Each structure stands twice: as C-alpha cells, then as structure tokens.
Regions:
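Extracytoplasmic/lumenal ectodomains and periplasmic regions of secretory and membrane proteins
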Residues: 138-189
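Short S/T/G/P-rich N-terminal loop/turn motif that feeds into the first structured element of a domain
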Residues: 2-146, 191-223
Length: 223
C-alpha cells in the first residue's frame, strides 16, 4: 500500500475536486417562498425603466416560484439599438451600443462565474440580406423577431444562482449599460441534451490525467 501512496493521495484529491464541481454545478435546491420574496424585493430596485421593470417582476416571480431545483440554460437573443438610449446612469459614456455591451460584460463576467454560471454558446448572426432590406433570418421575417445581432446561452446551476447574479449590487451597477445598448429577449430553458456537461468533462480529464501519471510512475519503477 505504501508503494502506491502517491497514487492514492492523487486519486483522493481528484475525486474531491470532481465531487465539489458536481455539487457546485448541480446544487439541486429549490427556492423557498422567503427566498423568492427576498430576491424580488431586491430586484425591484434594479435600474430598469419602471414600466418594463413591473412586467419583468411579474414574470420573474412566477418563474422563481415554479423552481424545480434543476440547472437552467438562459437564452439571450440580442439586438443592438442604433444608438444608446438616454439613461442617467450612462450619460457620461462615450461609445457605441456594442462598446457599452462589451464594457458591461467585462465587469459582469467575474460575478457570473462567482455565482456558478458560465456561457455555453455565443455566436453572431450571419445575416442573409443587407442594406435597407436587411434580415438575419431564413424564416420568420416579422420585425419583432428579425434582425437580431447575437445569441448567448448561459448555464446556471440553479434559479437561485441566476437571481444571485441579477440582484448583486455590482451587477446592477453595470446593468444600465446593457439596458441602454440592446434589446434582450431572456428565455429560460431546460437542458434536455447538452454535450458535454462541464462537470463530467472535468471528471474525464482528471481520470485521464491520473492514469497517465500512474502509468509514468509505473514505468519509472520498472526501470
């Protein structure tokens, strides 16, 4: 047993890392009513135009109260405004909507990762027509759904993690830059088929690394 002490310790460390990642990325806890009320109360202070915020609160509360404790994949369909909307929080910003969005994302990314969320897909619309008859779609040409600019899908380990991000004071500090720069359709989705899952990919990587190290050490012993 002493001969394989290093391998046993390494396997224990890797297993602990995998179990931690699995728990962190899949907590499985449902929101309580008290937690929902707390998040909604904090969300009511968000720097979003009042009429839009009121509608958003209704949808957010209903979704939070229907929590199933499972991870959620948040679809962001984004379309830039021709120019920044006039909001007091971004009055001093000198830049385009694209630059304002990049500024927001630069500061929000650490908060997102801290909450356990991470992007699984980001892509720009290719566009099919340009000029005055511009279009991003091959089907469905209603102006309400056409001419999008990009799609982003973010995985959250739980609805609680999403609300932790959304109500974080630092996140709210930069939210006006996103509100002023683009129209976002935010749609929560289930992950019926996602390849690969990050925690299992990590587990596979750790297993391969462990076997490689054990093999190298075995060769050295035999030499």
């Amino acid at each position: 047993m002493h001969r394989f002490r290093f391998e046993v310790i390494l396997a224990t460390v890797f297993l602990a890392a995998f179990l931690f990642a699995n728990h962190y990325l899949n907590p499985g806890n449902k929101l309580t009513q008290a937690e929902v009320d707390n998040y909604i109360s904090r969300l009511e202070q968000a720097p979003v135009p009042k009429a839009e915020l009121a509608q958003m609160i209704v949808h957010m509360r209903a979704w939070a109260e229907a929590d199933d404790g499972k991870p959620v994949y948040m679809l962001n369909l984004m379309r830039y405004y021709p120019q920044l909307l006039t909001l007091p929080e971004v009055a001093g910003f000198q830049g385009s909507p694209v630059e304002a969005t990049a500024y927001d994302e630069e500061h929000v990314a650490p908060i997102l990762f801290g909450a356990g969320g991470y992007p699984v897909f980001l892509g720009a619309m290719q566009g099919t027509l340009q000029g005055t008859a511009s279009s991003s779609n091959l089907m469905a040409f209603d102006p309400a759904v056409d001419n999008g600019n990009s799609v982003l899908i973010i995985r959250y380990p739980s609805r609680s993690a999403f609300f932790e991000l959304l109500t974080d004071p630092q996140y709210l500090k930069y939210l006006p830059y996103k509100v002023a720069s683009l129209l976002v359709a935010l749609s929560p989705m289930t992950g019926d088929l996602i390849l690969p899952r990050l925690d299992w990919a990590l587990g596979a990587g750790l297993l391969i690394l462990f076997l490689a190290i054990a093999w190298i050490r075995a060769l050295r012993r035999a030499a």
